[in-house]
Amino acid sequence: MSGAVCPGSFDPVTLGHIDIFERAAAQFDEVVVAVMVNPNKTGMFTHEERIALIEESTTHLPNLRVESGQGLIVDFVKARGLTAIVKGLRTGTDFEYELQMAQMNNHIAGVDTFFIATTPRYSFVSSSLAKEVATLGGDVSELLPAPVNARLKAKLAARD
């Protein structure tokens, strides 16, 4: 049985992320989305909210589950008996960074990373950009899963 992890902060999860999850789920028997804890970052959504939003947005993927993760991703992979890391790539800049990470993960733990090129319609989408546009009053409904868009609107309305 093959299993892979899709790690990230997902603050919030976007349709670009969902696209990568769907494509990974088609290639691996089991996919775990690891919502990584970063004590140096404060996000718009709490860690628990991010996990819940991904769960709500991926109910159509029976071989995918969402977990909290922290520390080295290779330790997460090994502890769960998974075999690979999956990362989405939007640009050459993403590739340069992710290639270094992939090589380090292979060096320290022998874990391979599989890269999935983002579908062109999502190639410009990032969590940061979606939050920025929404904060300035723009419509991001075509960039985010419906539950995420609704929760983002509610958070922004509560700030006003």
Swiss-Prot record:
<dbReference type="GO" id="GO:0005524">
    <property type="term" value="F:ATP binding"/>
</dbReference>
<feature type="binding site">
    <location>
        <begin position="88"/>
        <end position="90"/>
    </location>
    <ligand>
        <name>ATP</name>
    </ligand>
</feature>
<feature type="binding site">
    <location>
        <position position="9"/>
    </location>
    <ligand>
        <name>substrate</name>
    </ligand>
</feature>
<protein>
    <recommendedName>
        <fullName>Phosphopantetheine adenylyltransferase</fullName>
        <ecNumber>2.7.7.3</ecNumber>
    </recommendedName>
</protein>
<feature type="binding site">
    <location>
        <position position="73"/>
    </location>
    <ligand>
        <name>substrate</name>
    </ligand>
</feature>
<feature type="binding site">
    <location>
        <position position="41"/>
    </location>
    <ligand>
        <name>substrate</name>
    </ligand>
</feature>
<dbReference type="Pfam" id="PF01467">
    <property type="entry name" value="CTP_transf_like"/>
</dbReference>
<keyword id="KW-0067">ATP-binding</keyword>
<dbReference type="InterPro" id="IPR004821">
    <property type="entry name" value="Cyt_trans-like"/>
</dbReference>
<keyword id="KW-0173">Coenzyme A biosynthesis</keyword>
<feature type="binding site">
    <location>
        <position position="98"/>
    </location>
    <ligand>
        <name>ATP</name>
    </ligand>
</feature>
<comment type="function">
    <text>Reversibly transfers an adenylyl group from ATP to 4'-phosphopantetheine, yielding dephospho-CoA (dPCoA) and pyrophosphate.</text>
</comment>
<comment type="similarity">
    <text>Belongs to the bacterial CoaD family.</text>
</comment>
<dbReference type="GO" id="GO:0005737">
    <property type="term" value="C:cytoplasm"/>
</dbReference>
<dbReference type="InterPro" id="IPR014729">
    <property type="entry name" value="Rossmann-like_a/b/a_fold"/>
</dbReference>
<keyword id="KW-0460">Magnesium</keyword>
<dbReference type="GO" id="GO:0015937">
    <property type="term" value="P:coenzyme A biosynthetic process"/>
</dbReference>
<feature type="binding site">
    <location>
        <begin position="122"/>
        <end position="128"/>
    </location>
    <ligand>
        <name>ATP</name>
    </ligand>
</feature>
<comment type="pathway">
    <text>Cofactor biosynthesis; coenzyme A biosynthesis; CoA from (R)-pantothenate: step 4/5.</text>
</comment>
<keyword id="KW-0547">Nucleotide-binding</keyword>
<dbReference type="GO" id="GO:0004595">
    <property type="term" value="F:pantetheine-phosphate adenylyltransferase activity"/>
</dbReference>
<dbReference type="InterPro" id="IPR001980">
    <property type="entry name" value="PPAT"/>
</dbReference>
<keyword id="KW-0808">Transferase</keyword>
<feature type="site" description="Transition state stabilizer">
    <location>
        <position position="17"/>
    </location>
</feature>
<feature type="binding site">
    <location>
        <position position="87"/>
    </location>
    <ligand>
        <name>substrate</name>
    </ligand>
</feature>
<keyword id="KW-0963">Cytoplasm</keyword>
<keyword id="KW-0548">Nucleotidyltransferase</keyword>
<comment type="subunit">
    <text>Homohexamer.</text>
</comment>
<feature type="binding site">
    <location>
        <position position="17"/>
    </location>
    <ligand>
        <name>ATP</name>
    </ligand>
</feature>
<feature type="binding site">
    <location>
        <begin position="9"/>
        <end position="10"/>
    </location>
    <ligand>
        <name>ATP</name>
    </ligand>
</feature>
